[in-house]
Amino acid sequence: MKTLRTLKISPNAPDINSVWLYKGTMKYFNNGEWETIGGESEPYVLPAATTSTIGGVKKATNVGNLATGAELATVVTKVNAILSALKVADIMVEDAN
């Protein structure tokens, strides 16, 4: 058995009245059966973040580091690549055309 913070992870059968997370639902093992703690509920789905709503965000594409002493044109190209990666990942709002 190993412990992850306060959660115990084990391939063995649970102890009587131990609280476990099972398939996203909190349960305890009592008299040989799993008992659900709390009511039945739908799983939570994290919404996408928008300019007005907090939510999950996607990971942006990697943009490599600039070389030391890079020319201004190279810096401008790299900054534009970063902005593009943020927009493609829906982290930044697209330009209005």
From Swiss-Prot:
Q: Which GO terms describe its biological process?
A: symbiont entry into host cell; virion attachment to host cell
What is one term from the GO cellular component aspect held by the record? virion component
Gene3D superfamilies from the UniProt entry: 6.10.140.1630
Cited InterPro entries: Phage_B103_Gp8
Indicate where this protein is primarily found: virion
Does the keyword field hold rRNA-binding?
no
Where does the record place it?
A: Virion
- Read off the Pfam families from this record: Phage_head_fibr
Give UniProt keywords alphabetically.
Host-virus interaction, Viral attachment to host cell, Virion, Virus entry into host cell
Q: What does this protein do?
A: Forms short fibers at the surface of the viral capsid.
State how it assembles: Homotrimer. Interacts with the major capsid protein.
Q: What is this protein called?
A: Head fiber trimeric protein
The record lists the organism as Bacteroides phage crAss001
